[in-house]
Amino acid sequence: IYGMGKSAGNAPIELVAMHLNDCFGKDYHISQILEAIDANIMDFYKPATWGYNMFFFIAALNNCHPNYVSDLMNKRTLSVKAINQILGKLEGDKKLLYDKNYLENLYLEYQNVDVDDTADMAELTEAFAGRNVLLLGPGMNVEKQKDRIESYVKENDPIIVSINFVSELFKPDYIFLSNAKRYVQLATELLQKGDEFKVIATSNVTKTSGKFDYTLKYATLLDEDAEIIDNSFIMLLKVMIRLGVK
């Protein structure tokens, strides 16, 4: 994929697949190949780039203005499949005449999957009642503050909730998932360690098979006044407030 190999000149599988789809009536799922590129190659591609830019490939694949692709990728909340599905909703002249507000409405419409979370909220409220809670975000700060966190855990015996990642230093009781892109990256680990914790997902994240332990309505957790209305940490704080956590 992406022209990788032991030497230069390898044909990118995704470009071959697109050509076969367009010219020979094949039905290869290119989004799955792009997902593999995004999840496994982009981290080491950026310091030493080669070949074509996936960003422009996605724009060409959807015949749309490249700024649409840039805006969606910069959100860092969407899988490549989701990006292609949103771009597929662009209509008429809007495809090539960039309209940021139009795209934002399509994004929110796509993310806003409606669910009834009454039962799940009731069960979580009971589980969190009277308990201290420790929220862990991704990044280096958890490791830097390891001693302080260990001390807090020892003294308070909190429920530990990891936000869009699985902590290796502190065993979480729950994983809060609001980011579809992170879910794609974590899917294998969640499958392997599924018995060690429960997953609380927002309704914009779709499980590959079956259901998450808890699914909460995405729209009710948005912060309409914030620059990033679906910030994962803010969404989880709203969940904690609804659960009565103090």
Tell me the role of every PLM-derived stretch.
Residues I1-A122:
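Catalytic cores and adjacent flexible loops of soluble metabolic enzymes
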Residues I1, L134-N141, N164, S232, ...:
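Glycine-rich anion-binding loop/nest that anchors nucleotide
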Residues M18, D22, E150-Y152, L177:
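Alpha-helix termini
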Residues K94-D157, E168-P172, V184-T188, Q192-K193:
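N-terminal donor/sugar-recognition subdomains of glycan-related enzymes
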Residues L20, L72, L134-L136, I175, ...:
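Generic structural hydrophobic/aromatic packing signal, biased to beta-strands
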Residues G5-S7, A11, G139-N141, V166:
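Gly/Ser/Thr-rich beta-alpha loop segments that engage phosphate groups in nucleotides
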Residues Y152-I159, F165-G244:
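Acidic/Gly/His-enriched mid-domain segments of enzyme catalytic cores or analogous surface patches
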Residues K26-S31, K144, Q192-D195:
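Short, mixed-charge, low-aromatic patches
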